[in-house]
Amino acid sequence: MLKEEVLRLKREKNAVILAHNYQLPEVKDVADFIGDSLNLSMEAARTKADIIVFAGVYFMAETAAILNPDKKVLIPDPGAGCSLASSVSAADVLEWRRRHPNGVVVAYINTYAEVKAVSDYVCTSANCLKIIEAIPSDRPVLFLPDKYLGLYIKAKTGREIDIWDGECHVHAKITSPKITAKIKLYRDAEVLIHPECGCGTACLLELPKMGLSPKFLSTEGMVKYVKQSPARRFIIATEVGIIDRLEREAPGKEYIPAAEDAICEYMKLITLDKVHRSLKEEIYRVVVPEDIAKKARLAIERMFEFA
């Protein structure tokens, strides 16, 4: 079977497979680590493997390559892009900096290496609030590229933030009316929302008026939360692939997607067959030019200080 062959190749080649929470179940089945962007970046930084197969989208594999310049980082499908990462370029950031010379650029991890290289900090949804709150109040904050995450940060911290106009096309379709409709159907459910969602700010303001206390969490935060919560039913507002992970980690509970169509087609490009071929033939290596990697590494390492 293909699964057993992948496991055999991992042992022979001293390889590790890192799989994002949104990956297909068949890919998670052969992964050594499953997690969100922050956790997988940390695993990539400390792995002793010679080969890293990154089952995720391209910017994630780039981050692993930046942190492991001497290791072979493979992505099973180099076409696994990201609409959010593609919404901003290094040239855009440099022009933004020119207009705000005293600004501190905070780049969400969903950006390509060239953008990280011209940013001061990289953040994830798990540590963005800590990073923003650590920036001196007299320095303007330039946050990119996700406008919904930026608005959430602005609402939570009270900081004036200049926000880039980008979005994740998957999370953008998770709207406040969709959340409200699910709440009416499942009144006993806890509501867990990824801060990239299009509903974020509205839910932050409106749901408490309905007597609800929505939890805004990274995908890894969702996993931790459902494991310790006494609740038996949850409305999950993020890409639907996380539900498989939740069922693995906290079985016996009910997980209702806020939007059944919240599916990242880029994540789903990675299949078990492609993982097998990439590992067997050691193809689709991700290499970041050293001049870009060196600068991007600084911003990524600052992110780890707030992990």
From Swiss-Prot:
- The keyword Iron-sulfur is annotated on this UniProt entry: yes
Q: Where does [4Fe-4S] cluster bind?
A: C82, C168, C264
**Which SUPFAM superfamilies is this protein grouped with?**
NadA-like
The record's cofactor note says:
Binds 1 [4Fe-4S] cluster per subunit.
Q: Which domain of life is it from?
A: Archaea
One Pfam family recorded for the sequence: NadA
Which cofactors are required for activity?
[4Fe-4S] cluster
Molecular function terms, GO-annotated: 4 iron, 4 sulfur cluster binding; metal ion binding; quinolinate synthetase A activity
| One Gene Ontology cellular component annotation held by this UniProt entry | cytoplasm
Q: Name one GO biological process term.
A: 'de novo' NAD biosynthetic process from L-aspartate
| UniProt-annotated location(s) | Cytoplasm
Going by the UniProt record, its keywords in alphabetical order are: 4Fe-4S, Cytoplasm, Iron, Iron-sulfur, Metal-binding, Pyridine nucleotide biosynthesis, Transferase
Catalysed reaction, written as an equation: iminosuccinate + dihydroxyacetone phosphate = quinolinate + phosphate + 2 H2O + H(+)
Record Gene3D superfamilies: NadA-like (3.40.50.10800)
Q: In which pathway does it act?
A: Cofactor biosynthesis; NAD(+) biosynthesis; quinolinate from iminoaspartate: step 1/1
| EC numbers for this chain | 2.5.1.72
Annotated positions binding iminosuccinate: H20, S37, Y108, I109, N110, S125, H194, P195, E196, T219
Give the similarity note. Answer: Belongs to the quinolinate synthase family. Type 2 subfamily.
Q: What is the role of this chain?
A: Catalyzes the condensation of iminoaspartate with dihydroxyacetone phosphate to form quinolinate.
Q: What is this protein called?
A: Quinolinate synthase
Q: Look up and give the organism this protein is from.
A: Pyrobaculum aerophilum (strain ATCC 51768 / DSM 7523 / JCM 9630 / CIP 104966 / NBRC 100827 / IM2)
- Please state the gene responsible for encoding this protein: nadA
